[in-house]
Design a protein with these regions (language model features):
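C-terminal regions of RecA-like/P-loop NTPase motor modules
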Residues: 1-12, 36-45, 58-154
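Short, active-site-adjacent cap segments at secondary-structure transitions
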Residues: 19-21, 56-59
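Helical hairpin unit composed of two closely spaced alpha helices linked by a short loop
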Residues: 9-51
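Flexible loop residues that form catalytic
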Residues: 17, 55, 90
Length: 154
């Protein structure tokens, strides 16, 4: 809040939500309270908050390993408070024989003021970044995102 008063606050990044603590009776309530407080803080200081969250192990147990909103760990409140929820999915993590090596899906499952969908990007893991796929890349999509559509990332 001190930075916001000085006009020096453009973005708040939390890596990751479950590392934060407040006094509460249960971990579920604690994460819910943290999520609500971050939402209020973002509105108060007029700065966007990007909060990374751990996922539960449920997606590891499914055939389709793509994460969804119910996989957010320890609280459904995160889903309620978030304006945008985006997951990163890399098929090569689960299938070393995939033809989609070096690619990632950015899956937007909630976008309060926009469209949900999936963006396919190339990965440059050695530089910790994504980039647009070049024309010579082919992405074999095995299952489209329900309710959304694929988009080109600009």
């Amino acid at each position: 809040r001190r930075y916001a008063r000085n006009g020096n606050l453009g973005l708040i990044v939390i890596d990751y939500l479950q590392l934060m603590t407040v006094k509460s009776n249960s971990r579920f309530d604690e994460v819910s309270q943290i999520s609500r407080q971050l939402k209020v803080m973002a509105k108060t200081v007029k700065a966007p908050v990007i909060a990374l969250s751990q996922l539960s192990r449920k997606c590891e147990e499914r055939g389709d390993k793509r994460p969804n909103n119910s996989d957010l760990r320890e609280s459904g409140q995160i889903e309620q408070d978030a304006d945008i929820i985006t997951f990163i999915y890399r098929e090569e993590v689960y299938n070393d024989k995939t033809v989609n090596k070096g690619m990632a899906e950015l899956i937007t499952t909630k976008f309060r003021n926009g469209e949900i969908g999936k963006d396919i990007l190339a990965t440059e893991l050695q530089f910790c970044r994504f980039k647009n796929l070049s024309a010579d890349f082919y992405y074999k999509e095995d299952e489209p995102l329900a309710g959304g559509k694929s988009r080109k990332f600009d």
